[in-house]
């Protein structure tokens, strides 16, 4: 399910979309929480923001312990080197902190590992590319959803039709702050 080798198909998916994928210095480190140390994760985050060849940063996965990073993040460095940073679930702790401390936009969206999904990938890719590459676009809801373990290719996926109810029809624009 997890680990570097199991997620290489995510790299292939992103490369097939025309992206050059690189990995942080401490990407292969793993402790008892399937993470690396706070020091290593912060160093990797800072290195990615400081590197002019990096245009975007994808969180590897949600990261239930991502809140540990908050006191150690160099928000001045991030403000001076704005770039796309995207993740979901518990990654929203540092996404919202970066927005709050720097004003830089952050993206609640797929993590690197979710690009290994075989089913449900078409909608994810289209929605993500719209957010990453367009200044404005129409947000089109997915026609289906699933809460299956997408990360486990041995488990069957069961998609359900999306049922939408409009409470107040119209258009809106503005800043959305969300999270887990």
Describe each model-derived feature in a short phrase.
Residues 3-7, 69, 98:
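Residues at alpha-helix caps and immediate loop-helix transition turns in enzyme cores, especially N-
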Residues 33, 95-96, 116-121:
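Short, charged, surface-exposed secondary-structure boundary motifs
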């Amino acid at each position: 399910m997890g680990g570097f080798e199991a997620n290489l198909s995510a790299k292939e998916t992103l490369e097939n979309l025309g992206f050059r994928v690189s990995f942080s210095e401490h990407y292969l480190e793993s402790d008892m929480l399937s993470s690396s140390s706070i020091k290593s994760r912060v160093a990797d985050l800072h290195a990615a923001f400081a590197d002019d060849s990096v245009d975007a940063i994808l969180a590897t996965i949600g990261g239930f312990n991502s809140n540990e990073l908050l006191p150690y993040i160099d928000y001045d460095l991030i403000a001076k080197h704005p770039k796309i940073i995207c993740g979901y679930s518990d990654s929203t702790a540092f996404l919202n902190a970066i927005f709050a401390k720097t004003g830089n936009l952050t993206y609640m969206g797929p993590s690197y590992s979710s690009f290994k999904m075989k089913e449900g990938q078409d909608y994810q890719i289209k929605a993500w590319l719209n957010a990453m590459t367009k200044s404005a676009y129409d947000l089109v809801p997915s026609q289906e959803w699933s809460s299956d373990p997408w990360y486990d290719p041995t488990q069957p996926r069961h998609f359900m039709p999306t049922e939408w109810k409009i409470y107040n029809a119209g258009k809106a624009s503005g800043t959305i702050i969300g999270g887990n």
